[in-house]
Amino acid sequence: MALERSDVEKIAHLARLGLDDAEIPRTTQTLNDILGLIDRMQAVDTHGIEPLAHPLEATQRLRPDEVTETDHRDAYQAIAPAVENGLYLVPKVIE
């Protein structure tokens, strides 16, 4: 499927792109080249090929998800000027 000038003008309008008359032929050719590449990619027989999430078969060694620190909330809030229900109270700065 090849795009024509009217197609590119409509696409540019819908995408809110300001294309000059001089830019339309170059843009038309670029979009047609992209569509041609997509057609060639779709023509490749990929039956029986599993999709890859990543081209390398590398995996990350992850550490176990364990709690390594204790809760210091009470100690931190003990030195705060104002705390209520576990929340820090601050002066109102926006009316």
From Swiss-Prot:
Keyword Aminoacyl-tRNA synthetase among UniProt keywords: no
The keyword Ligase belongs to this UniProt entry's keyword annotation: yes
Role of this protein: Allows the formation of correctly charged Asn-tRNA(Asn) or Gln-tRNA(Gln) through the transamidation of misacylated Asp-tRNA(Asn) or Glu-tRNA(Gln) in organisms which lack either or both of asparaginyl-tRNA or glutaminyl-tRNA synthetases. The reaction takes place in the presence of glutamine and ATP through an activated phospho-Asp-tRNA(Asn) or phospho-Glu-tRNA(Gln).
Enzyme class: ligase
Species annotation: Azotobacter vinelandii (strain DJ / ATCC BAA-1303)
A Pfam family hit: GatC
Family classification: Belongs to the GatC family.
Matches recorded under InterPro entries: Asp/Glu-ADT_sf_sub_c (IPR036113), GatC (IPR003837)
GO BP term, example: glutaminyl-tRNAGln biosynthesis via transamidation
Catalytic reaction equation(s): L-glutamyl-tRNA(Gln) + L-glutamine + ATP + H2O = L-glutaminyl-tRNA(Gln) + L-glutamate + ADP + phosphate + H(+); L-aspartyl-tRNA(Asn) + L-glutamine + ATP + H2O = L-asparaginyl-tRNA(Asn) + L-glutamate + ADP + phosphate + 2 H(+)
GO MF annotations, alphabetized: asparaginyl-tRNA synthase (glutamine-hydrolyzing) activity; ATP binding; glutaminyl-tRNA synthase (glutamine-hydrolyzing) activity
NCBIfam families: gatC
Summary of subunit composition and partner proteins: Heterotrimer of A, B and C subunits.
Name listed for the protein in its UniProt record: Aspartyl/glutamyl-tRNA(Asn/Gln) amidotransferase subunit C
EC number: 6.3.5.-
Keywords: ATP-binding, Ligase, Nucleotide-binding, Protein biosynthesis
